[in-house]
Amino acid sequence: MMTLGTHVVLLAAAIGLTGVRADAQHLLVPMDDGQQNHLKAYGLTYTALKAGIKAEWLLNYRGGAFLLPDTPELRRRAGLDGITAQPTDAGAVAAIRAEIAGANMDAIPLEKAPRVAVYTPPDAPPWDDAVTLALKYAGIDYVPIYDEEVQRGDLSKYDWLHLHHEDFTGQLNKFHLGYRDTPWFIDLVQKNAATARKLGYPNIPALKKAVAEQIRQFVERGGMLFAMCGATETLELAIAGAGVDIAGSFADGTPTDDNADAKLNWKRSMAFQDAHLEQSPFVNAMSDIDGHQVNVPGRRQPLGAFTLFNFSAKFDPVAAMLVQNQRSVIADFYGVTTSFNKTALKPGATVLAFEEGAPWVKYIHGDYGKGTWTYYGGHDPEDPQHAIGNPPTDLSLHKGSPGYRLILNNVLFPAAKKKPLKT
């Protein structure tokens, strides 16, 4: 015969709540292998912050767990989304804090849901961008913006900006090499050219450089930038190449400046320096920043795996936040820009993830002005050989994706109450 207590236990198991206690004061959301849905756990934490409920990020504790107040609304959300959330009383929380105090761990307060913008074309399907896939799946609000919104100054409305595979040199990733006669590419060129004319620019490269400058200023003023894939490399080239013709004639009607390399001003860039442009219109690469050169026969490098650095949670909490994960080694994945050659990094760049023995790194972070930038190479962590026309990644099949977790770490990072470095 089933008792009321039996019903309570079965209900708790069904909705992802473990160890239900009537006197619980907190919900512990583990992020190690005990979590049923890592990606939606970020959305649960974001939901709390959006409702004005403060949370804590327990760095290096159980894979970067979250500690939330125990409310009926959060319990319900955890249950509906299949998120493992453990009701935890004051004594258990005290024990967790004692463990954190004596180890390479820390509890970081999360205070306010960040205002999130994603730079993406108005008609782009969400599977074009791993970040929009992650945000939608996790249930995190974002506002799509594009060139017109950037040019009218809308970036000031947001705390966090994401860029994906946009080519800020205006060469449309040199897709003309293989797709010039395809309807989608013809449409892409026409729409970008029309926007350039509408905003008063002579061509697409001029428009994209102007947008890149607005993004640079956004970071300089205190904004937080997260970029993936080709946007990482081309944003830096566009910023360093201000006032220099770095686009081929196929893009703007004039040849690239023969002395473009020498004229690049790397003092203006955020992450990279001393890179060399790929000026041939017949080579599908932008520069030598990318280590893998996926679209260049003879240069393409095989995929390996990358390792996350284990940072001090107490002394370097920002870097520690960005690498919270249940895995320390993650399978690599291609993108227009897959990795970043070490020789191109500025001295102030912090390497967050690297491939053992390789001349490139995968994941980097740094400060610029009053803001920060974070670059993550590759297109889709669960589609390593990504090609145009691939079906969208179904994140319900990758609920614990370590590669996607790195994306969502970046979304919650702006919510953290900053602590001064203990130097």
Model features per residue range: what roles?
Residues 3-18:
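Bacterial N-terminal signal peptides
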Residues 23-129:
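Hydrophobic targeting/anchoring helices
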Residues 25-67, 245, 344-350, 354-423:
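Extracellular ligand-binding/catalytic regions of CAZymes and related secreted enzymes
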Residues 27, 32, 36, 65-76, ...:
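Helical hinge/lid and interdomain linker segments adjacent to catalytic or ligand-binding clefts
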Residues 99-104, 148-150, 358-362:
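Alpha-helical scaffolding within the catalytic cores
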Residues 117-118, 131, 140-142, 216, ...:
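Carbohydrate-binding surfaces of carbohydrate-active enzymes
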Residues 129, 136, 233, 244, ...:
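Catalytic beta-strand/loop cores that center a nucleophilic Ser/Cys/Thr
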Residues 245-252, 258-263:
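Glycine- and acidic-residue-rich phosphate-binding/metal-coordinating active-site segment common to enzymes
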